[in-house]
Amino acid sequence: MFKHETVLLHETVDMLEVKPDGIYVDATLGGAGHSEYLLNKLNEKGHLFAFDQDQTAIDNAKIKLADYSDKVTFIKANFRDMKEALNERGIEAVDGILYDLGVSSPQLDERERGFSYHQDAALDMRMDQEQELTAKIVVNEWSYQDLIRIFFQYGEEKFSKQIAREIERRREVKPIETTGELVDIIKTAIPAPARRKGGHPGKRTFQAIRIAVNDELGAVEDSLEKALTLLKPGGRISVITFHSLEDRITKQLFQEATKGPDLPPGLPVIPDEYKPDFKLATRKPIVPSEEELEQNNRARSAKLRVIEKIIK
């Protein structure tokens, strides 16, 4: 069964200021914790559209949310296609959207999905099992320069060159097939003193490959830009991020959306059309409480940012 500790559960949904008869979107269904809490706040007129590109997540959520089946529509799609999918169903605007950008724990924990550096499995890492690009293709077929780029940009890995060089050396002998082989390569490439600190030595490289396989950052940027255009006045978007790359994208997009155009100084009154359409609902990101961190260590790096469309 899908086990998943929902991070910042109450904060994320409560910050949406849910209207009982509103239309809402869970862009990242996952273990359905946020969806369940949100559905509990809706009356018979309210509705939730829940997105996930992982069929397993949807199948499990249908069981978990069976009591709410008349109030929820499940959509198997990447959240970058959210606007188009909603438009196809006659939905042009919504009251709130939530994102939990963490990889759901079951995907990390299921050995055969190939996400984990703790378990030996085939190199896969696809969120959508129907897509062609896998971690095995990235590791064996991408150029030395491209590997350096993704390890550095997406993993913020200091030893990107050394790891890419060791991958190149090994794959000339035979294809790299498993997560265990990749971990061995990373351990060989990283100097011993560096291996002993900062958690598992494979953490950053695995993150980088996962982001590349699923085009995670491109999808986040595309989806958030479209999400802003879907909001009704007074509507809100809640976004939980887990690493600096996603948080930077979210922060920059939100800052851009809340800025008005450059106007000459000293205008007595700013015309409505020049006022920004959005405002930040939280000045600083909301982070998990000490109590939550004690119960769920995976929440440690979580940050919640919220934006609201201004009623004019």
Curated annotation (Swiss-Prot):
Q: Top-level EC class, please?
A: transferase
Q: A Gene Ontology biological process annotation?
A: rRNA base methylation
GO terms (molecular function) for this protein are: rRNA (cytosine-N4-)-methyltransferase activity
Q: Which UniProt keywords apply?
A: Cytoplasm, Methyltransferase, rRNA processing, S-adenosyl-L-methionine, Transferase
Domain of life of the native organism: Bacteria
Q: Which GO terms describe its cellular component?
A: cytoplasm
Which residues participate in S-adenosyl-L-methionine binding?
Answer: A32, G33, H34, D52, F79, D100, Q107
What is the catalytic activity of this protein? cytidine(1402) in 16S rRNA + S-adenosyl-L-methionine = N(4)-methylcytidine(1402) in 16S rRNA + S-adenosyl-L-homocysteine + H(+)
According to its UniProt record, where is this protein located? Answer: Cytoplasm
Q: What is its EC number?
A: 2.1.1.199
Cite the InterPro entries for this sequence.
Answer: RsmH (IPR002903), SAM-dep_MeTrfase_MraW_recog (IPR023397), SAM-dependent_MTases_sf (IPR029063)
Q: Which family does it belong to?
A: Belongs to the methyltransferase superfamily. RsmH family.
Summarizing the function annotation, the protein's role is: Specifically methylates the N4 position of cytidine in position 1402 (C1402) of 16S rRNA.
Instruction: State the name under which the record lists this protein.
Output: Ribosomal RNA small subunit methyltransferase H
